Amino acid sequence: MHLRAKPWATDWLAAHSDIVITQGRATEQIGQWQKLFAKAQPIHVEIGSGKGQFILGMALAHPEINYIGMEIQETAVAIAARKSFDQVGELPNLRYIYGNGNGVETYFEKAEVEKIYLNFSDPWPKTRHESRRLTYKTFLQSYEAVLPEHGEVEFKTDNRHLFEYSIVSFMNYGMRWATTDFTLDLHADAEKVIGNVETEYEQKFMAKGQPIYKIKAHF
């Protein structure tokens, strides 16, 4: 969903370039992301971080991990970064990229990222837009290029068609997962929901009684 532009967004991002890295700067940061954090720790990336509820929640819950939220919409990334800054200041383990998630290998080198999150991505339902889905094979190639051997992609969605499509895409690419890392109704499973950090969309769909599909797949 495209957000209405906020008049303050551009100036705020420019004033907080230590927190939000633009796409151009991100490509220059390849292999050096640990320098932007307080200390070297595993890096987890959310592609399509929206207004940032998930990535902020994860950064607060896991100070032992460095998190990067990647978002293409200026308004969304500005809202996310300002919200976290206003709530808790500059977190030592949270940064954002204002840029396109297409081609993450231009931002990170091999094994620089430990894990990738895809949360409630645009389903792009029309067949002619298949290549835009974040679980399409070319995206999987990009993820594999920055993750370590057997690196993990965690995917959540409310869209059954996109979930089924993604399962097939993962399988065709040779990815694998344990039966315990797969669910067709996340919030109906007391064990699987432990440690789950909800996104804004997740809360919205839960309120409507819609099931949330989730899988953690490995290369």
UniProtKB/Swiss-Prot annotation:
It holds the Pfam family Methyltransf_4. GO terms for molecular function: tRNA (guanine(46)-N7)-methyltransferase activity. InterPro entries: SAM-dependent_MTases_sf (IPR029063), tRNA_(Gua-N-7)_MeTrfase_Trmb (IPR003358), tRNA_methyltr_TrmB_bact (IPR055361). It is an enzyme of class 2 (transferase). Substrate binds at K126, D158, T199, E200, Y201, E202. It catalyses: guanosine(46) in tRNA + S-adenosyl-L-methionine = N(7)-methylguanosine(46) in tRNA + S-adenosyl-L-homocysteine. Catalyzes the formation of N(7)-methylguanine at position 46 (m7G46) in tRNA. This is tRNA (guanine-N(7)-)-methyltransferase. The active site is at D122. Keywords: Methyltransferase, S-adenosyl-L-methionine, Transferase, tRNA processing. Pathway: tRNA modification; N(7)-methylguanine-tRNA biosynthesis. One of its GO terms (cellular component) is tRNA methyltransferase complex. S-adenosyl-L-methionine binds at E46, E71, N100, D122. Its EC number is 2.1.1.33. Belongs to the class I-like SAM-binding methyltransferase superfamily. TrmB family. The gene is trmB.
